[in-house]
Structure formats: structure tokens, C-alpha cells
């Protein structure tokens, strides 16, 4: 059995457990890289099934067969390890497509991808002026996601409270901090790719689906050559960059498609996407083999256990800043994928994410050979999850059906199977 070291910030404890089904896994979260470390990050990953929680990654790098970076924020470390001969699953320099938003726009232009109207705005005074003069725009933070997620400004009056809050938070950086402001794309449908990429190459099959923002996802296995043209066009344009970057990681795109069929790449995910990576881990039989081979620069095709997957995101506002106790019926434990998880003295906890208030604490998934089976399995598995202030958004997987029908009406084909109507599953 191969040995693997997972280096994470804490969000992908469930991925470490899944890899442990095929490998000897050690799990490391850096927590002492600051003057005043806290105990929370040092406890994330404690008690994971089949996983050894370690305090020092460097004593292990020469003992393991490959190293996995499921999240962004490690590109310098990943590149150093690769340059010294270590086998790495990770985005490396490719993560800049996700975190360096303005550089990503420049890269898209260089690669021949259409780019919608957007501006690089420096400083809060300039941002305020821009939002006063422009409506229906999205404000994005480049490089410092912990400050704020992307937010919409429909008009200045509605955005003003958020801008005032951000102005105060930035302190002395308020006049020099850069923002990327994107204008709304007049699109008819959203499309995207969900899978992985090894040195610019994509597997012959992948997951494709619809996300209900921050609540759920419905996906199906589809042949790569049957993906909608806008999805394949974007991947083909990005492939040379991904090859040059030595990209070996999961990969997702979010594309807005206009009435004329023009694909505007809005966002990329160069890590385990959430959603739908929790579905990969159970829908794909040979995940461990794919990751190990990818770390060695080789693409292995996925072996699918089921055709459809349904994912409901688990929320708890209590977990935003407090340790949240959780429990799962052992019969459904395989289908519940918590983030920032630890098990201490037999009790499971979600440990608050450092530096940001995050209410999304995990995913409840179901898989099946029909979409109805996957949705029903997701609903059944949700019955076995307990936690303080916890909600499993199973309603979102039903809502996603409407998005699927809209996509198919605009020639973004989800599946060759006939899809049920939302009302039939309520």
C-alpha cells in the first residue's frame, strides 16, 4: 500500500479519509506559522478514520510516495517539492487562475478566451465611486479570500453598508487595496466542467451538473466529447497553460453562455471544488489510483460506481465561530463529508475555520443509476445527521432540476436520459 501525505488547511478532512481506503495516509494542517497560534487548527483532523494526524510534515516527505494538496494556498511549497523530485498532486502555479483574479483575466485574454467587461479598481474611494456610477456588478477580492467572498452590487445604496464595513476592516490598506469588478454577463444559461486535469489533459468522462449556490448540486457522468461546446472550448483554450503549469488536480469551471453561444469564464476552481468534489470521492471507485497516478504526471481514467449524484450542503451558523458537536448514524457515515472535522473522546466536532465565518460545514450525498435514486438516497442519508443548529439543504437538489431543464432548453445537454419534473419529486 502506497504512503501519502495530505497537506491541508482543514476543509478536506473527508478527502483524507477517502484516500485512506487505498493508501496509508498522514494528515497535516499548518498551525504554528504565526506568532500566536490557536489550538483549533492543531486539532483539525484528529480521530479521522484510518488517518494519522501529524505535527510535522517535513519528517515525512522522504517517507511517503506522494504528497497531496487538496486546497489552494500552497503553490510555492508544491512547486518547491516538485522541483526537488517529490511527487505532488496539486495545482501548483495553476492555482493563480483561481486566487489571482486580475491575472486570471489577463491569462484568459492571452489564451484567446472571451472576457466580459471588468475593471481593476484600486482603493476604497475609487471602488465607492465606481459602484456609485455602475449597477449590476460583482466585486471580487484577489488573493485574500479571507477578507470577503464575492458580493453583488445591484446599486450603490444597497451596497453601501457592505462597503463601509469593508473600508473599516481594511484599515490603513483602504487606499491601496485592489478589487476586481465584473459587470453582469447577459447570459441565458450557466455551464461548466467538473472533473480533473493532468498536465493539460482531461479524462474521457467527467461529472457535469448544476449548483444551487451554497446549498446543493445535481450531477451526472458524461462523456467528455458529449459536453456542450462552450465547456470544451474553455478547457481546450486553458489546456496549454495547465500543461505548462504542471497542473495535476481536480478542476472546475463556471461559464456563462450568451444567446449567441459565447462562453464567458466567470470563475475557476483549482482545488477540491465544494461542491461537488464530495461526489467524486464516492462516485469514482478508483479515486486513490487517480490521485497517485496524477501526482506522478499520469492520467488514469475514472471507474464510476453510479451515473448520478445528488449533494446537499450542510449548514450551521453556530459553527461559524464555535466548536459545533455533530453526530452521524453509522449506517450513513460513508455519505456525510464534514469539513474541519475532528473526533475527540468519541465525539465529532466541526472546528471553526480560522479567519473567516463559514456556515457551510459539510456535504450530504447520494448516488444512483437514475437521478431519482440519487436524490432519494441523499434525502435518506440526511436523516442520519445531527448537530447544533444544523440544516441539510435537501430542498436544493430538487430546485436544481429547474436549472437543468433551463440548460437543456438552451442546448446545454445534462443527460441523454429524460429528466423528471420538479413537481414529481416534491
Where are these regions (language model features)?
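ATP-binding N-terminal substructure of ATP-dependent carboxylate-amine bond-forming enzymes
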Residues: 1-93
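A structural signal for short, well-ordered beta-strand elements
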Residues: 47-53, 97, 119-120, 152, ...
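A conserved helix-loop-beta module that forms one wall/lid of the active-site cleft
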Residues: 91-157, 161-172
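Short Gly/Pro-enriched turn/cap motifs at secondary-structure boundaries
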Residues: 141-142, 182-186, 242-246, 302-303, ...
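Internal nucleotide-binding/catalytic subdomain
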Residues: 150-273
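Active-site "cap" helix and flanking loop/linker of ATP-utilizing ligase/carboxylase catalytic domains
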Residues: 230-252, 259, 269-335
